[in-house]
């Protein structure tokens, strides 16, 4: 799992496996630290997702940490179904396939001139994790 703040957008990249508890706890600290400056969260995952106990810890976070727009982009049917089934994120979060980046950007309010930077950041985080990254739209 890797994440970085780009402007007011938090970009998160997951590998095909779930984050370890150590990774997840570090991520929760990052969320608390940076969320006052974050308007939206973009998650790209190749199949990894938080575990039930990890989501329970996330759901105990302050409302400002949870109350932001989010988009999950993935080719994983499992991850798409899991996010769609989460009532706590129903109103603010949307799930998109890897062919629907434009929809994710529209949902998050990412401007056209910012999109190439966001996609380059997603690719860099994935490569840093050792992932074989698909060709993302330009």
Segments from the language model and where they lie:
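Amphipathic, Lys/Arg-enriched alpha-helical "gate/interface" segment within cytosolic domains
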Residues: 1-138
